[in-house]
């Protein structure tokens, strides 16, 4: 009847927790799978329930990311197929050609390890550990927020029944996040074409890899022979892998920058409450969107905005260098320009990893200054050559800055004259401003030879009205 009291969201939530954590296993598996965006496969859901119950009962401080690896590889297997001998031979030949061409375009030495060909499942399994490292700080923050929510809202009798609810919820929250991580990585395995496609080094720094199935699907959208696409992508991948092998500090720097950013994310209890009030717990689509969108992650702080800007600059420098080297190395390919444009459009649309980072750590990892960075690298190449350009990756302190991207000519001048001091740079900038007469204050000589030291008051002044007298001291 309409007048009968209906159980509220809190009642439903408490009942679900009670059944889950007490091991009764009476939760509707199809509803749980639908809310998490998971397939309603009985075997999978049974395994999921078992994992969540184990996580609740273990209550450890860490998070078991083996769940993420299992889920990622399961998704990657859907529609995936192994690399056949003909495709393997074609890819090997592409890597051989790419290595020869790349030797002419960069002084960065070749890899010692043989390039690999990954299936989607192999890529998912190989990269999940790094994804887990990146996402773990946020997973812990979400687990802690859920723990706080339960401690503040659960009735005393429920707390007593659950025992150490904090540890239980920390385990369950971590397991749920690990499942979501597996979802993201598994879906990503169907989109990436190479090991460096994400922009962040997810594989060992000495490994270059292509995903032949995804390369073929990428080539389907182009009016370009697949062999050319394969060679072009092999060049990009080798350039990316060579850079990270040569600049051994670079991989650790980028991964550490992301994890340090993620550690600054603290999800407050009121954010959990706010999100709970906005979502209808019976609406599986809303619940799934909340899990997949990273809605729990709060807005960035000023410190995080600054850290993100630095990280985006470094990613732009990496991708800009790869673009510059790839363009030079693939000049022989008739359709290299068309392939490069497709790569740029794909990246401008967000790329295969942007939504993944946004979901997992609230990062919009897009090298926004890529074109400017590539132009800067090209300027350095034209003026100083490939060896001096590539030597800039030898140490973090030698890498160009955001200011160098803005002023490549000044950067090149400084590289030509490394002994110049900061005062010299300041003097050069002031002299350049004066010669360019950016302010209009440079003294001018008229036709009679008279020097006007106040040109702003002269006849060239386009402003209307009487001119102000010169009151400056002589």
Question: Which residues fall in each region the model found?
Answer:
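Active-site recognition of the HExxH zinc-binding catalytic motif
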Residues: 228-248, 377
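Auxiliary, metal-adjacent structural segments of Zn-dependent hydrolase domains
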Residues: 91-213
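Pan-zinc metallopeptidase signature
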Residues: 299-474
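Long amphipathic alpha-helical segments used for membrane anchoring, targeting, substrate engagement
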Residues: 1-65, 154-172, 417, 422-446, ...
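Post-HExxH zinc-binding segment in Zn-dependent metallohydrolases
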Residues: 175-196, 244-296, 306-333
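Short pre-active-site segment immediately N-terminal to the catalytic Zn-binding motif
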Residues: 173-176, 215-233
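Extreme N-terminal leader/anchor segments
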Residues: 78-93
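A short mid-domain helix/strand-loop element embedded in enzyme catalytic domains
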Residues: 201-216, 284-301
């Amino acid at each position: 009847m309409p007048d009968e009291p209906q159980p509220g969201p809190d009642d439903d939530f408490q009942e679900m927790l009670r059944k889950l954590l007490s091991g009764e296993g009476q939760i509707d598996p199809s509803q749980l799978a639908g809310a998490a965006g998971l397939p309603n496969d009985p075997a999978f859901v049974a395994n999921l329930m078992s994992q969540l119950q184990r996580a609740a009962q273990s209550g450890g401080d860490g998070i078991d990311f083996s769940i993420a690896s299992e889920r990622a590889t399961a998704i990657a297997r859907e529609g995936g197929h192994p690399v056949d001998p003909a495709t393997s031979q074609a890819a090997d030949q592409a890597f051989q050609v790419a290595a020869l061409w790349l030797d002419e375009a960069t002084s960065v030495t070749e890899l010692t390890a043989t390039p690999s060909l990954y299936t989607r499942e192999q890529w998912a399994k190989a990269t999940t550990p790094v994804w887990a490292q990146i996402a773990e700080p946020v997973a812990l923050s979400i687990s802690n927020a859920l723990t706080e929510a339960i401690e503040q809202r659960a009735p005393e009798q429920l707390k007593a029944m659950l025992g150490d609810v904090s540890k239980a919820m920390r385990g369950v929250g971590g397991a749920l996040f690990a499942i979501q991580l597996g979802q993201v990585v598994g879906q990503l395995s169907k989109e990436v074409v190479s090991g460096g496609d994400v922009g962040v080094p997810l594989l060992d720094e000495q490994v270059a890899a292509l995903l032949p199935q995804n390369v073929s699907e990428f080539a389907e959208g182009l009016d370009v022979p697949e062999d050319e696409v394969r060679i072009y992508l092999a060049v990009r991948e080798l350039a990316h892998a060579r850079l990270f092998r040569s600049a051994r500090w670079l991989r650790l720097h980028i991964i550490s920058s992301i994890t340090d950013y993620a550690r600054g994310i603290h999800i407050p209890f009121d954010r959990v409450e706010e999100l709970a009030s906005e979502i209808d717990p019976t609406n599986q689509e809303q619940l799934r969107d909340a899990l997949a969108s990273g809605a729990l992650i709060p807005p960035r702080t000023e410190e995080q905005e600054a850290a993100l800007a630095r990280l985006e600059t470094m990613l732009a420098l990496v991708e800009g260098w790869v673009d510059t080297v790839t363009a030079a190395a693939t000049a022989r390919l008739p359709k290299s320009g068309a392939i490069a444009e497709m790569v740029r459009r794909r990246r401008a649309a967000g790329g295969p990893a942007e939504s993944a980072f946004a979901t997992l750590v609230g990062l919009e990892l897009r090298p926004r200054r890529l074109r400017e960075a590539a132009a800067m690298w090209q300027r350095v190449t034209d003026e100083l050559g490939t060896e001096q350009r590539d030597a800039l990756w030898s140490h973090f302190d030698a890498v160009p800055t955001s200011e160098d991207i803005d002023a490549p000519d000044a950067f090149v001048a400084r590289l030509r004259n490394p002994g110049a001091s900061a005062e010299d740079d300041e003097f050069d900038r002031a002299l350049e401003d004066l010669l360019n007469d950016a302010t209009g204050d440079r003294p001018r000589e008229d036709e009679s030879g008279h020097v006007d030291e106040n040109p702003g008051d002269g006849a060239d002044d386009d402003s209307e009205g009487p001119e102000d007298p010169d009151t400056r001291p002589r």
